[in-house]
């Protein structure tokens, strides 16, 4: 016997209801499946509907059911599906539940949550909705442009965007310099993703998403107006496109430095376009791409002062007060002024009176462990330029923070070599797309054009399977990309690989980057957590030397572990129970077929005999009753089927009146009784009816025609006692038509000769036509001297032939061969044919009567 669940018998109906729930039909939001009645392995649809309360009411504790429910996710507003597997406390055949549950789970695919219950407290609609919400994994809503973070940013930005005034906004405190660079968190500049006018490209949107999920240890006010870039696009149309600026490593926009007195650039409103510097080319101010990237020497630091390269403000400028380049960049909406003012002003004040800024920066011991640049520009620079920028940009943070009092208007200029080294280091992540800084890029481009240098434009970010491949070589006219890098974590592995390839070209200053590889293998997993957009923050690293690479590491492995946890228990729960509980129920199944096989079929004719038993006490049993079972052995006439009616003969209406009736046995004439049911009873008057009024009795079955058999008469008398060798005359009292070939026809009042008393119910005789055969003994009456042979009596208990008795009770004949009489009447010619039944004459009629109804005279 198979214990597998049958889903094909009602497969079409199951599929239709299941598809209705999946398709979101209004009239069907749930369906319940159960077993067909009487068939424990056939699955069918039990109920369906759209009321969730009715869904929970359908689960009965006496059944095993499977439910499929559609609910609305409160987080996303989408339709979610729930599979409910129910095994009631009082359900039968619980052992097959786990096997069938696995089959139903494969059949009803597409569910999000599976719930197993066994009592009503296990199923609650609020709990089901909560589980669906927890399983969705999204417990946030989409922010609009009017969100709270944007309002805070606007308030802060409005308070700090007045650049012409002398008021300064206090910068956020910088973290301690003891914090390792590897643990510096990413600044939260990307919190401006909810800006009203965010027309940046996809890279900025990607970076916004990353920063929203990144925790920052740097307490920097969120006031970088990334959205201002969109507003400035129209004003920048007349300006040349800024040179792209890519930064995957630590870099910062710094004021220009020179050996001469520093000129300050006055900030003009965006509606006054500035003259293009990067596009103004002269033969003496530019060098070829090949020469610009050739190895540099200390002679590069001896350049013409940058005062000659600075653009002059428009003649119509409303303010002549010089401002710093940092404020100008903030005007373009691309710099977090409040966060960086303290960092840059310290540098401006410290380098104001220094003749050689390079030698001054070389004294700083900080940031020696930061990985070197690995891009094309850094490879082609001289070894001296990389450490210069490396140490120049890595001043102690304490000094930078303490320089908040320094005026931003005093800005020394950097040398060309320092700028080139810093830009090359900023271009370390050529696969990233940093945000665009229009005015900063313009100044860098103009500076390069004057200094005769150019930088290669890094390739766009791609999922390069081979990060060891060398980057493209720069070409003349190309500029650094200014798109936001997609992922800061991607920068570290490339730096490590590229640093290994640059050991020959760059001296011991690059070696500090070797300790970084431990963080590399963990960070590549971060892109799956959507961290790529954090790269745009790279240019702001100088403001706070802390990096959040460490906190990101534990989050990456935790994300893939969540989906694996719920799957394991469900998979293990399916294969456990299929074998054990099924065994005890196997023997119970084959038993029912044994019950329907009715072995009592042959006993069907016995029920009629059963009622005779209780009624026997009421009427004396006839001696012929035991002879009835022998009739089937002889070829029976058509009346044989009537034999089962013999039990009804013993019933007598007068029996309840007679206390002695229970002890009366049946007379030997009982075989004749079967035909009585078809004949009405004679009148109660003791007057003997005429022969024409008597009804024909039922023919008893023929006894087996076997001469060797010794038939019994009266239950104890052998056939030899009543078998006569001579003919005995008899008269026919009823007409009889033969139904078998060995029978003869009898006509009423016809004289026949009895040849042999074969049985109490059948005799062998010869009619007036000379035909010999069997005939019913109760259809004739013996008239000759051998009259007693008709019913050979047993040993008479009282008297002999011609004896008379007196009736002591009224008796109504139940059969045609019985005698009716009233109390005190005399019955003559009594023959004691049986101890319980006697034969006598009364009112001109002869018949049988119970012996306990009379007394001897």
UniProtKB/Swiss-Prot annotation:
Low complexity: compositionally biased ranges: 205-217, 522-561, 612-622
Highest taxon of source:
Eukaryota
Q: Note whether Cell wall biogenesis/degradation occurs among the keywords.
A: no
Q: What are the GO MF terms of this UniProt record?
A: actin filament binding
Q: Where is the composition biased (Basic and acidic residues)?
A: 193-204, 229-240
The annotated regions of Polar residues compositional bias extend over 276-295, 371-385, 399-409, 443-452, 498-511
Give Gene Ontology CC terms: actin body; actin cortical patch; cell division site; cell tip; cortical actin cytoskeleton; site of polarized growth
Ordered alphabetically, the record's keywords are: Repeat, SH3 domain
Domain (SH3) spans 725-785, 800-857
One Pfam family matching this protein: SH3_1
Give residue spans, biased composition: Pro residues.
Answer: 587-596, 602-611
**Where are the annotated segments for Disordered?**
167-562, 585-622, 693-723
Enumerate the Gene Ontology biological process terms: regulation of actin filament polymerization
Annotated SUPFAM superfamilies: Actin depolymerizing proteins, SH3-domain
Tell me the ranges covered by the ADF-H domain, including all copies: 6-133
- Claim: Repeat is one of the keywords in the record: yes
Q: What is this protein called?
A: Protein app1
């Amino acid at each position: 016997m198979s214990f597998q669940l049958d889903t094909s018998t009602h497969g079409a109906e199951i599929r239709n209801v299941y598809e209705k729930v999946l398709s979101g039909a209004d009239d069907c939001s749930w369906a319940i499946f159960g077993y067909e009645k009487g068939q424990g392995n056939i699955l069918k649809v039990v109920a369906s509907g759209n009321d969730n309360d009715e869904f929970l009411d359908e689960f009965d504790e006496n059944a095993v059911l499977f439910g499929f429910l559609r609910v609305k996710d409160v987080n996303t507003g989408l339709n979610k599906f729930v599979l409910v597997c129910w095994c009631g406390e009082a359900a039968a055949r619980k052992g097959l539940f786990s096997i069938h549950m696995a089959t139903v789970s494969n059949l009803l695919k597409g569910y999000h949550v599976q719930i197993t219950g066994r009592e009503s407290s296990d199923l609650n609609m609020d709990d089901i909705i909560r589980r669906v919400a927890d399983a969705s994994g999204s417990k946030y809503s989409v922010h609009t442009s009017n969100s709270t973070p944007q309002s805070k940013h606007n308030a802060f930005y409005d308070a700090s965007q007045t650049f012409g005034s002398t008021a300064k906004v206090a910068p956020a405190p910088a973290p301690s310099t003891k914090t390792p660079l590897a643990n510096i968190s990413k600044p939260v500049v990307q919190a401006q993703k909810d800006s009203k006018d965010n027309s940046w490209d996809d890279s900025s949107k990607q970076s916004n998403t990353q920063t929203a999920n990144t925790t920052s240890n740097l307490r920097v006010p969120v006031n970088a107006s990334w959205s201002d870039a969109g507003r400035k696009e129209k004003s920048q149309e007349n300006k040349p496109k800024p040179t792209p600026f890519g930064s995957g490593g630590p870099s910062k926009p710094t004021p220009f430095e020179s050996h001469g007195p520093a000129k300050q650039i006055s900030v003009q409103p965006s509606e006054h376009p500035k003259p293009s510097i990067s596009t103004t080319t002269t033969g003496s101010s530019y060098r070829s791409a090949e020469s610009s990237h050739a190895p540099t020497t200390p002679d590069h630091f001896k350049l013409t002062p940058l005062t000659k390269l600075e653009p002059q403000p428009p003649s119509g400028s409303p303010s002549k007060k010089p401002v710093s380049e940092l404020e100008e960049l903030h005007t373009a909406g691309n710099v977090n002024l409040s966060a960086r003012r303290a960092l840059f002003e310290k540098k401006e004040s410290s380098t104001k009176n220094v003749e050689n800024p390079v030698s001054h920066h070389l004294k700083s011991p900080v940031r020696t462990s930061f990985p070197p640049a690995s891009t094309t520009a850094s490879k082609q620079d001289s070894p001296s330029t990389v450490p210069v920028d490396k140490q120049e940009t890595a001043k102690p943070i304490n000094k930078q923070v303490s320089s908040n009092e320094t005026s931003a208007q005093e800005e020394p200029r950097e040398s060309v070599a320092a700028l080139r080294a810093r830009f090359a280091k900023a271009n370390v992540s050529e696969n990233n797309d940093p945000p665009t800084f229009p005015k900063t890029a313009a100044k860098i481009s103009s500076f390069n054009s004057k200094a005769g240098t150019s930088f290669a434009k890094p390739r766009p970010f791609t999922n390069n399977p081979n990060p060891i491949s060398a980057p493209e070589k720069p070409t003349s006219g190309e500029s650094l990309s200014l798109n936001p890098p997609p992922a800061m974590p991607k920068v570290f592995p490339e730096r490590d690989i590229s640093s290994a390839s640059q050991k020959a070209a760059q001296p011991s200053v690059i070696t500090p980057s070797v300790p970084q590889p431990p963080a590399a293998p963990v960070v590549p997993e971060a892109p799956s957590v959507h961290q790529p957009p954090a790269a745009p923050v790279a240019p702001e690293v100088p403001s706070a030397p802390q990096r959040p690479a460490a906190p990101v590491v534990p989050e990456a492995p935790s994300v893939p572990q969540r989906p694996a946890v719920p799957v394991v228990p469900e998979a293990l729960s399916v294969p456990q129970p299929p074998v054990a509980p099924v065994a005890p129920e196997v023997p119970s199944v084959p038993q029912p077929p044994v019950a329907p096989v009715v072995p009592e079929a042959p006993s069907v004719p016995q029920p009629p005999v059963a009622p005779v038993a209780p009624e026997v006490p009421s009427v004396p049993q006839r001696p012929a009753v035991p002879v009835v079972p022998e009739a089937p052995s002889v070829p029976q006439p058509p009346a044989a089927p009537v034999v089962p009616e013999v039990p009804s003969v013993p019933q007598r209406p007068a029996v309840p009146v007679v206390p002695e009736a229970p002890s009366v046995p049946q007379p030997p004439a009982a075989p004749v009784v079967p035909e009585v049911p078809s004949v009405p009873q004679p009148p109660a008057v003791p007057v003997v009816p005429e022969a024409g009024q008597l009804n024909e009795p039922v023919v008893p079955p023929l006894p087996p025609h076997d001469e060797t058999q010794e038939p019994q008469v009266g239950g104890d008398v052998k056939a030899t006692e009543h078998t006569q060798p001579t003919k005995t005359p008899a008269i026919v009292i009823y007409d009889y038509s033969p139904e078998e070939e060995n029978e003869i026809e009898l006509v009423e009042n016809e004289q026949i000769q009895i040849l042999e008393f074969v049985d109490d119910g059948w005799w062998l005789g010869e009619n007036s036509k000379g035909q010999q055969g069997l005939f019913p003994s109760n259809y004739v009456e013996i008239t000759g001297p051998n009259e007693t042979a008709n019913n050979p009596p047993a040993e008479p208990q009282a008297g002999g032939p011609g004896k008379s008795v007196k009736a002591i009770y009224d008796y109504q004949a139940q059969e045609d061969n019985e005698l009716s009489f009233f109390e005190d009447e005399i019955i003559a010619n009594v023959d004691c044919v049986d101890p319980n039944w006697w034969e006598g004459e009364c009112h001109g009629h002869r018949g049988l009567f119970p012996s306990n109804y009379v007394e001897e005279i």
